[in-house]
Amino acid sequence: MLWPLDSIERRWDMLAPHVVAYGPPDEEPRPAVLLFHGCAGIRPHIDIYARAAAREGFRAFVVDSYEPRGWSQAYATTLVCAGAIFWGRERAGDVLAAVSGLAQDPGVDSSRIALAGWSHGAWSIMDLMTMPLERPGEAALADPTDEALVGVRSLFLAYPYGGPGALSRSRPWLRSPETYGVVAEKDHLTGQADALRNFDAARQAGASPHVWIAPGTHGFDAPGHEGFPSPMRYDPELAEGCQDRFLSFLHRTLDGPDGVFAPVVETSAAFGT
């Protein structure tokens, strides 16, 4: 561990000023999706997904794990993407703290929350699902508890890292929210077989994850990966298909008994402003 253990409250106090909220400009309790970026930090596609969710009537919160720690994109790309620091099991504390904090927001229906992660963010969510959350140190927190996770209905996991260090390789999940996995057929970080095998951890908990094998590379939905020497290639058609699946999944798992929310004008702001 590279830093002292935070309490859940202290971790949320650190993260909250850097969370960007998208959603209808009202105070009605609405279903919410929390979005967790990949190892290179927040890239434009994360905001695209958040805005799309907001237009459908959901609240969307983009959680930045790097700005609160003073980490630049270059620093994160060099160390986090290389696996030198901040593994999924540590960032899982950010996921838990964000759920705990945002579930208390009066504009959030705490019984209808989805978690969405891309690459490192998806890894962190998956690691969290394997943790009992009963003893200090789990998720790099002093006081982990699964109380806030009761309202987490669904997980959207886009090309999660599933190589060495990913807890789902060796541990079953202990929770079984509805899960939609996106596996990139040409992923250079986690081979297709390993990626699919990691979803077996969800099945061991009684979940029935739906997995879409997208015929693209890791990061296929992220603009900016178009050229050499990156092994990642942006595919706008696949990106649109992934966004459609994301929205359909949110509606299927978060819509209440009254059905689909009417489209609304979305706004964005730093959380709490």
Language-model features: where?
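C-terminal catalytic histidine-bearing segment of alpha/beta-hydrolase fold enzymes
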Residues: S208-T273
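An N-terminal hydrophobic leader/cap segment in hydrolases
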Residues: M1-P25, L115, H120-G121, M126, ...
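Acidic beta-to-alpha connecting loop that harbors the catalytic carboxylate
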Residues: E185-H188, G216-T217
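Conserved alpha/beta-hydrolase "acid-adjacent" motif
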Residues: H188-R197
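Glycine-rich His-Gly loop
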Residues: L35-A40, S119, P160, A184-E185
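Short beta-strand/loop motif that positions the catalytic acidic residue
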Residues: R175, G181-V183
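Primarily recognizes the serine-hydrolase "nucleophile elbow" in alpha/beta-hydrolase
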Residues: E90-L174
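Serine-hydrolase catalytic machinery in alpha/beta-hydrolase-like enzymes
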Residues: D6-G23, E28-V108, W123, F220-P231
